[in-house]
Amino acid sequence: DLYTSKGLFRAAVPSGASTGIYEALELRDNDKTRFMGKGVSKAVAHVNKTIAPALISKNISVVEQEKIDRLMLEMDGSENKSKFGANAILGVSLAVCKAGAAEKGVPLYRHIADLAGNPEVILPVPAFNVINGGSHAGNKLAMQEFMILPVGAESFKEAMRIGAEVYHNLKNVIKEKYGKDATNVGDEGGFAPNILENKEALELLKNAINKAGYSDKIVIGMDVAASEFYRDGKYDLDFKSPDDPSRYITPDQLADLYKSFVKNYPVVSIEDPFDQDDWAAWKKFTASVGIQVVGDDLTVTNPKRIAKAVDDKACNCLLLKVNQIGSVTESLQACKLAQSNGWGVMVSHRSGETEDTFIADLVVGLCTGQIKTGAPCRSERLAKYNQILRIEEEL
């Protein structure tokens, strides 16, 4: 909570389930007697006892986002924000950004656009994660997210309607094939039917899209989160079963599987197809396919990792997660670095989301044109989509 003469500005920081090893540090108490070790009293104390007094004494205006973020980074002094915790720094950074917009008397998305030097704003295409697997779900499915992108919609409002209708058609398709309990939802609001074959998930999507009557307006995206099932240079597509190295497949075999998906289904975007350090596989794959290849665990919204990925031509789109890097200023830098190198950028939520809607304004202000913030289900996901609907009405 940040108070200025204009009122109260509040931010909440999300948390990820499948985190990349190069992400900024999320500071937890590790006191097993409280919240299973996941308490954040240390991070909160850093805000109240160190960061807040410093910002108040320096008397910097809340519109000076970069100055405030730089001050916090200097005070922390570590490479990955391990002293204060990225969760402490980001909470303040987000609240400052909201306060800055109010100080200027403009909507948050305009303030963000100003900070990024964008004269215009753009509404995004939503990527709805409607089938969940991987570390987000209790099924056997290895690949983490299967998304629908209503690229043929004329407006965000229409995109929401298409997404909702396909989602409910998918629910019926799954119920008919696997029974009612297969329609329980995963962390991000998507369904998590107990299937093993990743192709089966694509088949279910294709079916639901056709039933809803939108086969001409929707394309499919995937987030494989392959770092979660990388084993000794190979990949285990049945990683939730007892370990058996004989079933591991090579990066080339995995790449061929992706190519078969692209050939047989309208798959136009694949995120984290390989492990976060399997640079050779990324490079080879991106050069050989004409689709969007998104870096998440690979790039962790970190300008240094992005620069390496640009040099290596490892991918062609950045997944932007504010809590991977831990400040608004660095998030804008990461976005601009990617865009200036001709990459796409997709703004993203985390599996452990909050009701905070900052990323809805962020995606509009940064003009990235793409956002993924879950299925049209669960209010912490819908909060973001509803905020974009409101922004569209305003514009």
From Swiss-Prot:
Gene Ontology terms, MF aspect: magnesium ion binding; phosphopyruvate hydratase activity
InterPro entries the record matches: Enolase, Enolase-like_C_sf, Enolase-like_N, Enolase_C, Enolase_CS, Enolase_N
GO cellular component entries: phosphopyruvate hydratase complex
Cellular localisation: Cytoplasm
CDD domains in the cross-refs: enolase
Annotated GO biological process: glycolytic process
EC number, as in UniProt: 4.2.1.11
SUPFAM superfamilies documented for this protein: Enolase C-terminal domain-like, Enolase N-terminal domain-like
Free-text comment on the cofactor: Mg(2+) is required for catalysis and for stabilizing the dimer.
Active-site residues, as the UniProt record annotates them: 188, 321
Segments forming a coiled coil: none
HAMAP family listed in its UniProt record: Enolase (MF_00318)
Entry similarity comment: Belongs to the enolase family.
Name of the protein described by the UniProt record: Enolase
Organism of provenance: Alligator mississippiensis (American alligator)
